[in-house]
Amino acid sequence: MTMKRYIIGMMVLLLGLSVSAQTTYTKADSLTVCRLLKEAPAKASTLWFARQFHGVPYVAHTLEVNDREQLVVNTRQLDCTTLVETVTALTLCVKQEKRQWTDYLQALRILRYRQGVLNGYTSRLHYFTDWILDKQQMGLVEEIQRPNPPFTALQHINVNFMSQHPGSYKALKANPSLVKEIRQQEKALTGKTFRYIPKLAVKNTQLMRQTVKDGDIIAITCKKKGLEIAHLGFAVWQKDGLHLLNASQLHHKVVTEPMPLRQYLQKHSTHTGIRVIRIK
C-alpha cells in the first residue's frame, strides 16, 4: 500500500514537472495564481476572479515570447484574450475543486489549445469562434444564442486575416510554412453562422438582464474584413445597464468600463453587436 502511494505520488510529481517544463512564467505569476486559488471562496464567481485583475496593465502579444510554442502564464500584463483565458482557467479550477498551481496550468493549457493539446503555434486557438466551438465541444462553455429577441442578428463567419497578413504575426513571419495550416483552419470556420445581439438591442431591459448573466464572456462582433471578433470581456450589470470588464487598450489596464456597453458599442463603428458565452 505504501509503495502504491509512492508510485502515485511520483506520477503526479512527474506530471507537474512535465507541464512546468513546457511553461514560461515568473515567480510573481505562480504566487498570484496560488494566492487567488487559496483566497477564492468555495463558490467564487467569474467576476470575483476578474475583479482581482483590475488595474493590471494592458500589454499585447505577451504569448509571443518564445521561438517555440510554450504555455505562457503572465498575470502581470494582460490583453483582452489572456484576461478571459486567465479568469476562465481560475474559475474552472475552483468549480472542479482543484486549487494547485499544476491544476491551473492544466486548465489554461486545455483552454488555450485545440482539444487541450499543445502541439506548436497552430494548435493555439487564434480565432475566438474556433475557441468557442472547441471549448463547447469539451463541455467547458456554452454559447448562448436564445431567445430571439434579443438574439435577432445572424453572423456569417468569413475569416482570413491571419493568412492574409502573416507579417503581422511573429511566428508566421518566422515560419511561412505555418500559413497553410492557418488557412485550413480559417476555411473550416468560414461559412458557419451564429446568432448574436445587435448593438442597438443591447439595452437595460428585463429581457436583457434575464438573457445575459454577470460573468458571461462577451465577444464583440465586428465587420472588419477577415475578422469576426473585435474584443472580449466579461458582463457586469450595474444600475444603468450592462458594462464590460475588460483589458482596455484605451485605458492601458484592466477596467470595468465606466460607460454602459450600449454606449461603448456605439462609439465603435465597426462593432456590430455581442455574442455571449457562459462558463459551465
PLM features per residue range, with description:
Residues 47-56:
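Glycine-rich, acidic and aromatic/proline-enriched surface loops and short helix-turn segments
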Residues 216-280:
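C-terminal soluble interaction/assembly domains
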Residues 58-195, 213, 237, 241, ...:
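Acidic/His-rich structured neighborhood in mature extracellular/periplasmic domains
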Residues 197-208, 222:
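Short alpha-helix capping/helix-loop boundary micro-motifs
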Residues 207-211, 227:
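Short, surface-exposed secondary-structure edge patches
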Residues 31-41:
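Active-site-proximal helix-loop elements at catalytic-domain edges
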Residues 1-26:
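Bacterial Sec-dependent N-terminal signal peptides
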